[in-house]
From Swiss-Prot:
Participates actively in the response to hyperosmotic and heat shock by preventing the aggregation of stress-denatured proteins and by disaggregating proteins, also in an autonomous, DnaK-independent fashion. Unfolded proteins bind initially to DnaJ; upon interaction with the DnaJ-bound protein, DnaK hydrolyzes its bound ATP, resulting in the formation of a stable complex. GrpE releases ADP from DnaK; ATP binding to DnaK triggers the release of the substrate protein, thus completing the reaction cycle. Homodimer. This is Chaperone protein DnaJ. PANTHER family: CHAPERONE PROTEIN DNAJ, DNAJ HOMOLOG 1, MITOCHONDRIAL-RELATED. The keyword Cell membrane does not apply. It is found in: Cytoplasm. The keyword Flavoprotein does not apply. HAMAP family: DnaJ. Belongs to the DnaJ family. It comes from Pectobacterium atrosepticum (strain SCRI 1043 / ATCC BAA-672). Keywords: Chaperone, Cytoplasm, DNA replication, Metal-binding, Repeat, Stress response, Zinc, Zinc-finger. Coiled coil: none annotated. CXXCXGXG motif repeats lie at residues 147-154, 164-171, 186-193, 200-207.
Amino acid sequence: MAKQDYYESLGVAKSADDREIKKAYKRLAMKYHPDRNPGDSEAEAKFKEIKEAYEILIDSQKRAAYDQYGHAAFEQGGMGGGGGGGFGGGGADFGDIFGDVFGDIFGGGRRQRASRGSDLRYNMELSLEEAVRGVTKEIRIPALEECDVCHGNGAKPGSSPITCPTCHGNGQVQMRQGFFTVQQACPHCHGRGKIIKDPCIKCHGHGRVEKSKTLSVKIPAGVDTGDRIRLSGEGEAGDHGAPSGDLYVQVQVKAHPIFQREENNLYCEVPINFAMAALGGEIEVPTLDGRVKLKVPAETQTGKLFRMRGKGVKSVRGGAQGDLLCRVVVETPVNLNERQRQLLQELDESFGGPSGERNSPRSKNFFDGVKKFFDDLTR
């Protein structure tokens, strides 16, 4: 079976310089490397093909021989003197190539820095009143805190971490894997470049200890479910003196027995009897600041909304305060005595029945529509 042209294998022109060849090889090697394609025989074969092509074309002597003789230059006896066949010596510096390309795959590349502490989350449940007015609450959270004996460096007081003798402070070591060399985090110091010979007796060299701490959290007025408050530096302590993480307080507002909130407006339902709805009058309605009087005009229908401006929620981000919207619900009277029943019957008769035109225009329109509907069906 004929071999693929080396230039075609790398997808470069025959005039490509070393920089273009190296760039093409890095891109293809990353794509087809066996560690990224486990169990894929086609990817493995492609990887071997591009590796062979790269080894020939990056070496000026081998490239010149290939340009003149093609693949025959590297077949058994096909080239004298300095050729060498297959994957023979010289050519690519795989330690250099794969140190760049596969550093992340094999865990190497750079010295590992002490990691920042983890962020923490605390779920805080508030009443509607607390959310609207704002409140200060104390919370207690478990967290990893900086050790107060070694002050986070993990070493026994009076001593200090020493340079790792395995990686000599680099935090990484070179490992030979097949035809190339890769860099990995030093297994002795775990990539830090230093080791603790005399660990702190309290934190055992970790630089952090488990503690519970109490914090005072100020909740601003106007917060709502889903809002998040960030307390910088109040998360877990960082690794060996690295910065601490943050604490995020997640707000959840409990359901209220009277009010419902939509953005900065409050809604409530206010029941009124049918006499009040028909004749009008004045009622007391609740607000978060106490009761206020509301005038109900005569002939008010159930479901009508009354807006009380400025009685809603103050925006946590500034701006105008929301409103309170009261929806009146006309109640049907129950538990009637004989006198009340008699009066209602007299009232009904005075209306002229359920479809009385003057007193119940919507009822008349409804019954007129029903009559027309059935008339149309019988035509």
